[in-house]
Amino acid sequence: MNREQIADALRQNQVVAYPTEAVFGLGCNPQSESAVKKLLDLKQRPVEKGLILVAPSLDFFRPFVDFEQINDEQLSRLQGKYERPTTWIVPAKSTTPHFLTGKFDSIAIRLCDHPSVKALCELTGFALTSTSANLTGEPPCRTADEVRLQFGSDFPVLNEMVGRAHNPSEIRDLRTNQLFRQG
């Protein structure tokens, strides 16, 4: 499928696969509880874990992130350029749905400059949920064909290439800089 078709599927609260910096991600509209539930069911992922959101700019995260709790130094770190994709755990607004935050009062976000992510966010007007496109026990998909093999030939997948990163993103707490996952 092309970008416009994937954007239409996202607006219709479907779960789609799209390329990120290193692997294909499974994504949906983060403001749709039914779409997120489909995603969690597909991944067999407990809601308590929370989800990562990706977007090309901070504006897409404004509905979810409590920017009043982020100081200038942290904001600079959040917007920094790093040699590997970096996901940051940041304070969530009290209105951010639990189906995104899980058992936490924070949310994971990643500024992503992959052209596919940028285009899909601009076409839909929202950030995307991002969890690796793979079934439990299977390796993350790095091509659209691998996505179809794991999820079926009819699964909505954006036919574009992943970026040059070799590993999924590093995950750090923005306030403490604590490393949760090595990238």
Swiss-Prot record:
GO terms for biological process: regulation of translational fidelity; tRNA threonylcarbamoyladenosine modification. Its main location: cytoplasm. Residues 1-183 form the YrdC-like domain. InterPro entries: DHBP_synth_RibB-like_a/b_dom, Sua5-like_dom, TC-AMP_synthase, TC-AMP_synthase_SUA5. It catalyses: L-threonine + hydrogencarbonate + ATP = L-threonylcarbamoyladenylate + diphosphate + H2O. It is an enzyme of class 2 (transferase). Pfam families: Sua5_yciO_yrdC. Keywords: ATP-binding, Cytoplasm, Nucleotide-binding, Nucleotidyltransferase, Transferase, tRNA processing. GO terms for cellular component: cytoplasm. It is found in: Cytoplasm. Its EC number is 2.7.7.87. GO terms for molecular function: ATP binding; double-stranded RNA binding; L-threonylcarbamoyladenylate synthase; nucleotidyltransferase activity; tRNA binding. Required for the formation of a threonylcarbamoyl group on adenosine at position 37 (t(6)A37) in tRNAs that read codons beginning with adenine. Catalyzes the conversion of L-threonine, HCO(3)(-)/CO(2) and ATP to give threonylcarbamoyl-AMP (TC-AMP) as the acyladenylate intermediate, with the release of diphosphate. Belongs to the SUA5 family. TsaC subfamily. This is Threonylcarbamoyl-AMP synthase.
